Amino acid sequence: MLPRRLLPLALSALLLGGCAGVGTQLPSAAYTAAFERAARQDSMRSECDWRVRYAPVAPEGASLAQLQALATARLAALQLTPAWTLAMPGSEAHAFADTDADRAGLQLLLSIVLPAMERYPAGIFAHTGLRRVVLVKDLSVEGQRRLAMPAPEIDSVVYADNMLAAMCPSGMELRVHHEYYHFIEYRLFNDFYYRDPAWLALNPPATVYGQGGAAAYGKGFQNLGHPHAGLVSLYAAYGPEEDKAEVFGWMMTPAYAPRLQQWTAFDPALLAKRHMLMEVLNTMAGSY
């Protein structure tokens, strides 16, 4: 793995160089600046294993219609349907167009989202009331740029290409699972911010949560792993709702699960949290 101080340079050189192959023109100065800014602001950059890559879901040159048809078929096998637009108060996003750049963005997004969703036990989405996966680009929530969000009010989770090519691929998969857990939590308690007493009881006595996950956005935040006993990541410390979603995300993402497993070998609080979420997952899968 590259030293952390070299990662932004490596991203710009390798990933942006690859983007130059899309179409016939080199990226504009504005695009290059936006790409490099997205790379620097990727909160999973410091904890990324850059060797982990996701296979394309379709041949190079697949049309937008072909990519959408492939996504529709694979999601149908999970009892899910895709949506290609988003209309929710406080949120904005754009639909993918049939351009080289958008096809490449959708191909990358699908290469991460589809296998992530296929990791779940059969029937779990139906049991939790998830019906749709919204796949868009340029997502923002209350003006904050986002890659994903839960949307239980429309029975959906939302995943977006938002300069995704500049970011850690496995970090995006972690976000897929993280946001789905927020969806699960809302279905269980009708509240995104439920302070579950059973969960809080697992914390070491010195655990103090922050002011919620939104406070981490736009500040160059780096989501470092296992900063304190009982916490899988720095972002987990922002609130019990983020703590749960982070443990779930690390547990479900193959590139991160081994580290969680290692930490639980000497952190009994984190081990208990992982066991609790495994029980939630198994209960929901088994009750379908």
What do these predicted ranges mean?
Residues M1-P8:
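Bacterial N-terminal signal peptides that target proteins for export
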Residues G17-G18:
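C-terminal motif of bacterial Sec signal peptides marking the signal peptidase cleavage site
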Residues Q25-C48:
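Post-signal peptide N-terminal segment of mature Sec-exported envelope proteins
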Residues D49-A55, A76-A104:
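Acidic/histidine-rich, surface-exposed loop or edge segments in extracytoplasmic proteins
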Residues S63-A87, G210:
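Low-complexity, intrinsically disordered repeat segments enriched
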Residues G90-I154:
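Auxiliary, metal-adjacent structural segments of Zn-dependent hydrolase domains
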Residues G129, V134-Y288:
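Active-site-flanking segments in enzyme catalytic domains
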